[in-house]
Amino acid sequence: MKKILLSALLLIGGIAMCPALTREGLTEYKLDNGLTVLLWEDHEAPDVTGYIAVRAGAVDEPAEYTGLAHYLEHMLFKGTQKIGALDWEKEKPIYDSIIDLYDKYSESTDPKVREQLATQINECSMRQAKVSSLLDFFVLHDMIGAEGVNAFTSYDMTCYLNTFPASEMYRWLNVFSERLINPVFRTFQAELENVFEEYNMYANDPSSQVQEQLQKDVFKGCPYERDIIGTPEHLKNPRLSKLIEFFNTWYVPNNMALVIVGDFDAEKAKPMIQETFSRLQPKELPARSTYPEVSFAGNPTKHYNLGYNPQIAWIYQGVKKGHPDEKALDFVCALLTNGQIGLLDKLNTKGDVSAAYAYSDARRFTGRIMIEAIPYYDANQQMFESDKATKAIVMKEIEKIKNGDIDDALIANVKRLYAQSYKTAEENTRYKVNALVSSFIYNEPIDDIFTDNEYYQNLTKEEIVRVAKKYFDAPYMTISFDEDTKTPKAKTLPKPNIKPVEPSNEETEYCKAFRKLPSEEYKKTFNNFNDVEISSIGSNVTLRYTPNKKNDVFTLTLRYGIGAHEMPLLPYAAALMSNAGIMGSPATEGKDFKQQMAELGADVSYGCDDSYFYISISGEDGNMNKIMNLVNRQLLMPYLEQKQLDQVKGSVFFQRLSRQKRATVQKSALLQYALYGKNSDYLDEVPFADIWGLGLPKVQSLLAEARSYALDVFYCGSLSKDKLVAELPLTEGMKSAKPLYIKDMQKYDKPTVLFLPNSNAQQADIYFYINGRPYDIASDVQSGAFNQYMSGGFAGVVMYEIREKRSMAYTAYGIDRKGALPGKDCYFYGYVGTQSDKVNDAINVYMDILTDLPKDSSNIDAIRIQLKQSAQTAKPSMRGKASTFEHWQRLGYKEDPAKTNANAIDAVSFSDIEKFYNENIKGKPVTIVLTGDPKKIDLKAIEKKLGCKVTKISNAKIFKSTQELYDAVM
């Protein structure tokens, strides 16, 4: 379930922008066939984002065929009777046979008969592949420089999306409309295996299991109780005819929207849209089902041993999308959780709980109010606080809401947070896309995008109290989870016995015609480093100043030239400072400090990496003086309660204690060990005894020391440079910054296999690592071309060989990674996530790729276009310009990399890719880093393939001993 904080509300439909944002550039209309068209010009966007939004998702599936919506999303990348068709007349009877065979397969319960039918389906699929081009759809997108070709399925919608240059508007509209006309669901059997892989990827993740169980209980009796991906039983019993039926029912123009946002001309686009999308034929939609509300009468409770740590959820009845109380209920939940000053946020700030938050989850048919908490962990007692005690703490705040005991200042400050969020939403192209999509999916007026903020600002306390009482003074369900110490295996889907398809991949007639379709001249625009004014404003103090002409919200980052490498305890001081108050002031407690900042429309956070200490501040320029006053006082006289210190220490204690049982952390630690050896983040970490001894005096001295080093100021706002400098906390005699710390990579001069056995893992993780050259920008274009050839989406060699042909994995890639600075090591980094019983096959195929790269020069034009488009759209946001330009300059660029590399991109050839491969990959020793179920992996076969012994790695090798934790607290 979504955990929605106010900062994330910009991505949720029904939330408004500031009144200053107008309809300028926005066009909405319908074609005669009922297709909704939503166009929003944004000429500061680097490209164009295009969506097809379908008002159908997992809730619209028949109960006996779950997973259809998600599986259909996968299949709509497989082409049509034109896209991907080499000879449709020959292909059609084979396709019809596959549909018929799947019907028989679904109806049969005899294992032998089903096995025979599966073999026949596989044989037909291989025959169909010979008369089709599996990659056609992706090659077409590569031709136009489309990026981020993707889709997603939720309960209420399915969306297909990517970005593309405006010069390719006509061809993009052509292929995006064509994909919806007579689609052909090729390689259905193989793609089902990819869905199996996706299912298995989450099946043994305890966190995913917790969320799945919540869904089942919270939405009992409604399709929302089902997992979007479908049940194992239904996934094992597919029926292609039902997929076709689902498409024919819901994928009709009167149930879809075309959403285009970005740097384009809407008037030019309209006739193109008419020509391409008016081809879709409308149909009458079936009546949607309705579902009775679940009763929480009697305050039912449920308990499960599931997950990594205790967790409690209290669930109230909410409202569905479009309900008259929806917006007011959102606001009430923001009074509890907004990331800064909510009633539950204060519990987090004080250290009373490990985490607590609330949100309203409104959906098409129903809604829920979710209150969730993780209890406080006491490192002294080495246990979590009881559910009963945690409930008392959380429900005390809920009682305030329920009883209307809501402070006027809190209401005013939350309104201020909303208003400021909507101001900055104007800068966000993604917000515009999501707002339009949500408006369509939930039949909300487009005008709400522009008027909702006015609604929130005019919301009265009486209305807030009415809604709070109505929904919180009601029965609720309690669901609690305790850590599952047994780690039970979830149901996973078996490896089928199918042969890989061998598509022809000749060029189709549609592809040939597509090449000739008109496109406009590619518009080259480049970033100008002079957009950021750089000046020295003191000894070892540099200002990077970016003017903000859009609104009065500033962002200010103070970056000091020392980090965790030199001061290992600094990250913990930073974590504590984010919740600190000011000693001896009205803002003594952290919650009071946050309240004062909120009254100024401001926020501050602290962070640290290996090389730098950061203070990040945002707020309204008109309040800069007061904001900086508060921040300076907090830095000079921080106040921390003992429980805040204990909460951070307890969090670190539990994380280190439990991480050896977490598969995601295990694989991260194994990879860190392979890449950095003893300098792994999990081995070269602060002794817990040092953290345990951390107190307020030490925090103060750490801050004072960090702030004595060179300062880089990154500002984006509307103040003049002189006014800004007058407000900055500048001191004399700042020391030179410490050198940037970049870890050295491990060197492997022979093939190596590092294996961490995990008998509980169905999902295996395979990493491939090859030491590379010292980094220099001169190799960027060749490296980029190689990466595009290897992992440029589904048409890349790795995805094509591993997933598209053989269905071995849901995720697979291989790229050349740049060194962090000139002279630092580059390296090849590859990955395959697959079932343990497919590991040997996946390693064999991947090693064959690395040993002898498949050669296909036919796509070099598309690779060139992709490189050009990627370079052209690497345009940072207004607030990101300063840091991005600095990064490019550190790498060695004196201007926009797109400009420097333009000629090299135009001239790149397939021989450049071959040369890069020969110099950096071919014949180099490969290190494989592997974790999975040892009973399902043939280690001897891996040794034979690599020509080396497999080195088994234990947790003791990649983690520090937990004994240091107990020694510290004794």
How does the language model describe each region?
Residues 1-22:
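Bacterial Sec-dependent N-terminal signal peptides
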